């Protein structure tokens, strides 16, 4: 790598760093992605087996929109790479009578047209008989949410970015582990 120049250096090959480098590469830039331990290593927050992707973030429409966009990007990556990166398991919010946050989540999901369903305590026990509704006022079901296979996803993303860079003629684009 000595003597190479890059348009951008991205520090950290976790979820945010990997996506940043990936999008810069797609934009035709020469990118160096640095991480002390490599993409999605066990010390990184993106290095675990799974992370929840959900749409509900209270009244925060911006974060909810970002979550939708993020999920679409992960699904597109899975399609390109032929790997199973996301498991659509749904997200179930269990709420008490005083839970204003869940009500805000529901309002935001409704406003943005995101599929969701409110369940009474009785409906909850019928739909999910393994859950006791004792102390639960109502539940909110987000069927489109689920689990992202975090480590595999970030590693697939970095590999996909490098593939795209090489096909675009960027032989110098790389991932490096700094030498102490």
Label every model-predicted segment.
Residues 2-16, 32:
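Beta1/beta-strand and adjacent pyrophosphate-binding region of the FAD-binding site
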Residues 12, 35, 95:
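Short beta-strand/turn micro-motifs composed of small residues
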Residues 50-127, 136-137:
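Dinucleotide-binding Rossmann-like beta1-alpha1 core, especially the glycine-rich loop
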Residues 25-46:
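Glycine-rich FAD pyrophosphate-binding loop
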């Amino acid at each position: 790598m000595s003597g190479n120049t890059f348009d951008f250096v991205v520090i950290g090959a976790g979820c945010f760093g990997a996506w940043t480098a990936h999008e810069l590469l797609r934009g035709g830039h020469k990118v160096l992605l640095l991480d002390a331990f490599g993409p999605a290593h066990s010390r990184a927050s993106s290095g675990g087996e799974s992370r929840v992707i959900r749409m509900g973030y209270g009244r925060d429409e911006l974060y909810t929109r970002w979550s939708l966009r993020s999920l679409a990007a992960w699904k597109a990556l899975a399609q390109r790479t032929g790997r199973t990166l996301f498991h659509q398991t749904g997200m179930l919010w269990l709420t008490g009578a005083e839970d204003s946050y869940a009500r805000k989540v529901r309002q935001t999901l409704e406003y943005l047209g995101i599929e969701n369903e409110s369940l009474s305590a009785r409906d909850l026990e019928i739909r999910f008989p393994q859950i006791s509704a004792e102390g639960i006022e109502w539940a909110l079901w987000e069927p489109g949410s689920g689990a992202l296979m975090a480590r595999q996803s970030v590693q697939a993303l970095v590999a996909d970015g490098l593939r795209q860079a090489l096909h675009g003629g960027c032989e110098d684009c790389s991932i490096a582990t700094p030498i102490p």
